[in-house]
Structure formats: C-alpha cells, structure tokens
C-alpha cells in the first residue's frame, strides 16, 4: 500500500531491475518521494489524519507527491500522546468511582477485564503511531522493488478495481463508526440513569478515538500485504506465460490480473526526468528497463525476451519480492505482535461480557447485540491481518509448483534447465512468509491457535466468576 522512492526502476538492457537494499549506500541518498493516486492516496490520507502516515501531500496532475514530513511526525506524536493520557486518566477515574456507580465495571472481575481491554488498545495505538515515521521511511525505500516488477511484466491499471476498493474501505469505516457510536451511546444512556453521562463522555472519548487508530493500522498493513501478493501473482502469471512460450503449458490461459488489483497506483519521481512516468503504463520508453512482457495491440501479454532470460529475470523479481516481504515483516513487527495480543485479549474479554450478560438474564437485548457485533468485529480484525499473509504464502507455493513442473517438463539440453535449477535453489533459501519478530507465522493455523486459546481462557474466567459469586 506504500509508495516507491525517487529512483529509476532498472538500469542496463538485459539485466534485471536492481533491487535496493538496506546496505546499498546509494539508497539513503535518493529523494524520498513518490507519486500516488486514487485509493492509494485515500488510505494514505486517512492514515495521515490518525498519525499513522506522517507524510506531506503535494497535488499533481496524476495524483499526489508524498514524502516524510517533520511537521506531520510532530502532529502524530502529539495526537497519540494526548489521546493516551486522556484514556489513562479516564480509566483511573472510572476505577475510582467504584463498582456500584460504574456502568462498565460492575464487579471486580469486570474491572480487571475492562482495564485489560482499554490498555491493549492504548498499547496497540502507541506502537503504531510512535513507529510510523520509521515505518514510512522503510516503505518509501522498498517500494522501488514493487515498481521494478510493474515495469518488467507490463502492468496495467483497472479503474473499476480501484473504485471497488474505495467502496470497501468506506464501507468498513462506516460500519466501524456506527458500531463505535452505538457502543458509546449505549453506555452514556446507561450512565444517564445515575446522572453520570458526562463522566462517560470525558472518561472514554480518548479510548474510542484510539480504536480508530488501531483499525486504520490493521487496514494499512492489509493493504500493503495485498499489494505485494498481487505482484507475486503477476510473477507467477509471467512464469506460466513463459512455459506456454516453450510449449510446456502448465496452466490454462487466463486473463492477466491487474497489478493494481488492490488499487496500488504508483509513479516514480525521477531525478533525471522532468515529468513523472506511471509505472503501471505498458510502454516504458528507453532500453534501460528490464521489460519481460509487453501487451500486444490485441491486449494479449507477449514475451519479448528468450525464455531462458525470462526465467532469470523472473527469479530476480521473485527474490526482490521476497526481500519486500521480509522488510514489511520487520517494519510492522512490533505493531503486528501487539495487534495479535490485542485481538486475543479482546476475543476473550468481549465474549466474557456477552456470556455474563446471558447468565444474569437481565434481558438487555441491545447490550447482547452490541457485544455480539464486537465479537464479529474482532474475528474480522484477525482475518484482516492473517488472510493477506495467507494469500501471499499461497502465491509463493504456486511459484514453487510452477518451477517444479517446468523442471520436469522442459528438455534437459541448453541453458534453461540450469536457470530453473538456480531458481529452485533460490526458492528453497527464500521463504515467502510474514514472521513478525520471529515469534509466529501469520497464516491460517494461527487463527486456530488463537481460537483455542480464547476457549481455554474463557472457561477459566467464567469459573473464577462463578467461584467469586
């Protein structure tokens, strides 16, 4: 979901596009800018407002030029610090009221559970915002690799896809806003019975605003991961096209996937070009770009280099994308771990309140529906983080399968078998997976583990509650 830096995407004819590395001394000297448009600019604008993307936006004819802004960094720090302080003071004030007057903490156990609920939101938002400047700098660097893929395999742009993504993002934010508003109003109305409605407003306003920061952070990561997954899909499609070119059809021919399938519209801001050139346009001028595929007049993708050279370049692009995956994992490492812990705790806390409400039989239907919607929201939050990573891992497995079938189907003479052998060794050494801080792998088995842990802790909490009564 991020942008690339202002360097050329490739250099010498016949060579693959270079991949910037953290050890490259020239990487840091490049101007940290890029041009974004459409839904990409939309998610960045929202992230910037909530302190998760401290960028400056300069309007251009084809989108916005974005770069790190010191003023926005200060704004982000001040925003999250004020919200965290307000939330902590509100939590302490609510605890001091006591269980008799509190509408959210009616017992000692609910005091403990609600405190955990508030603190995990505070920690998640803090980890996301305080680490945002470094994360954005890393994004601006490694997205040059994304740009090199777009250039090499004849990427094309879909306006309809971008509109769909914008609609999905708006729908998610509207649903969450309605849920937050309903939750806030419910507790305010409950507090009105004992003339404490304004106490609820002042004590919890920071908490609810921090919830937006958490949600935007999760959407930001999902957007980024899905954009990389789209490039893996495109590399796999190019690999299948190469196989068909040498009369080894591995898959049924299908329509090429738009590389902005998740509305990633990126353009590089070159130091040597007066105008910005869209990296999603097929006709890139000049010989310095390591183009592998171009779209013919009929719209069909066409291989423009020999199959052996195409395999070599695709291996380089695949390696570049693997490096991008690892950099994303490093950039989002701490926030992802905190998000997973936060989701685990919320999946324990919310069903706990729901079950307790059912057990006391107070017949507050509104509260039951509200807690059920929060349970659904937390499950969806977990899938928002895990599913893009799962799809990316599957794309990596598809690459392995394609290379394996190519190795067993191609003739044993010439350079092609050796290129495929090198590609297969690269796949063995470079895994496609998100492992934040090396603590876990973001994949569907993690969902099963979380749900198992939730069940175990819910049983323990309910037993403690019954014992206390």
Language-model region placement:
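A generic structural signal for well-ordered alpha-helical surface patches
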Residues: 390, 394-397, 401-404, 418, ...
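Juxtamembrane non-transmembrane "cap" segments at the membrane-aqueous interface
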Residues: 403-424
